[in-house]
């Protein structure tokens, strides 16, 4: 069947269903009743009675089920229906004219797959052993005007699955499982930090000054105040203000927004966990992260070793690797030129086809080589440490080498999953770094940070020794659900207009 024929066929079915709905309206019946109260979920019935004997089934009494009709077989005066409810499972109904009035049964025969119905009755087991509700009452709750995807071919168009997630969730159990796992992951994280005396907080989503990360912001305008506002790219500067104020352990799970590209790993709107702990350093946070990730894997998957896109990931051990060592190991031709900016610029151009222009800062150039030549090779959990200070404007300098910072990024499966560091709490140093960032912004770097005078003022009151970290929830869910694209773990990912 051609695409046009499919559209014509679907339009014909929609027209037929609209006629059925109009017939219901014409009989002066309530077309969309809202008084059905189910007593059980399909999953609950299967759990409690799949292996029960006849005595157990009879003791169950009357059960009431509500859900979407996913299958229907009419055989004269008797029919079988499969209903799927919010538990994600289906239960079979046996519907016969003997148990219903002739009028009700005739109405039932006109209902379509996709309709939402309510039924009550007693449990029994068919000759094939399937748990079934012998229906003595049945009602139409919501008339579905659009047919579900063909049950044999399903919803195979990936783009339609993203655009019409509501249909995807109806027909794809795997998609439902992903989002149930996502909810479980977030719940575990929340309890993990609460158990360690972290306070969950909420900080602004609209900022007068963009900051907290190197990214291009979304810009909006506040009419009443006649001022520009920026959707937050990170909550970092507000969370550290709270530590200044005396909340020594805080965390937030919320959205960030970055006006950048869309890819298998990037969505303009994404969920981030950020947490800050006073009297801790980046080593403490790496230790804490290992415990968090191992506990998550054990809870969600039942193991710390799991498959991700054909590769076994092992959460039982995490490597710690200085960035310089990583570059030397994975890009050996860079090992002897990391202090020679012109040669690094040449290497970036010849090996990675990256034009670094007139960049002369070796720290920036080494980071560029790392991003192009190393990141995607870090499959097993690896904390890359000792980031150059020039690319870490909010991080504390290393005591022994002020050109690097006490910062790490965690890579798993070739992707950055987390970023953390001992926080810069020297107000004067922070002010100077903000000035450098502001100059870079004025020179055309749209991802450079702005000067945030209020944050500097907060630091002047005194930020205790603190470490902070951000973890990308979406990428973490991708790992733990074996999802190849970030769109697979976002209920409603951003898409181009149809």
UniProtKB/Swiss-Prot annotation:
Residues annotated to bind Mg(2+) 1: 409, 416
Positions bound to Mg(2+) 2: 416
GO molecular function, one term: ATP binding
UniProt cofactor(s): Mg(2+)
UniProt key word Magnesium: yes
Group of enzyme by EC: ligase
Leader sequence segment: none
Entry's localization field: Cytoplasm
InterPro entries cross-referenced by the UniProt entry: Aa-tRNA-synt_II, aa-tRNA-synth_II, aa-tRNA-synth_II/BPL/LPL, Lys-tRNA-ligase_II, Lys-tRNA-ligase_II_N, Lys-tRNA-synth_II_C, NA-bd_OB-fold, NA-bd_OB_tRNA
Record EC number: 6.1.1.6
Record text on cofactor binding: Binds 3 Mg(2+) ions per subunit.
GO CC term (a single one): cytosol
Catalyzed reactions per annotation: tRNA(Lys) + L-lysine + ATP = L-lysyl-tRNA(Lys) + AMP + diphosphate
Swiss-Prot/TrEMBL keywords: Aminoacyl-tRNA synthetase, ATP-binding, Cytoplasm, Ligase, Magnesium, Metal-binding, Nucleotide-binding, Protein biosynthesis
GO biological process, one term: lysyl-tRNA aminoacylation
Family: Belongs to the class-II aminoacyl-tRNA synthetase family.
NCBIfam families, per the entry: lysS_bact, PRK00484.1
Complexes and interactors: Homodimer.
Name of the protein: Lysine--tRNA ligase
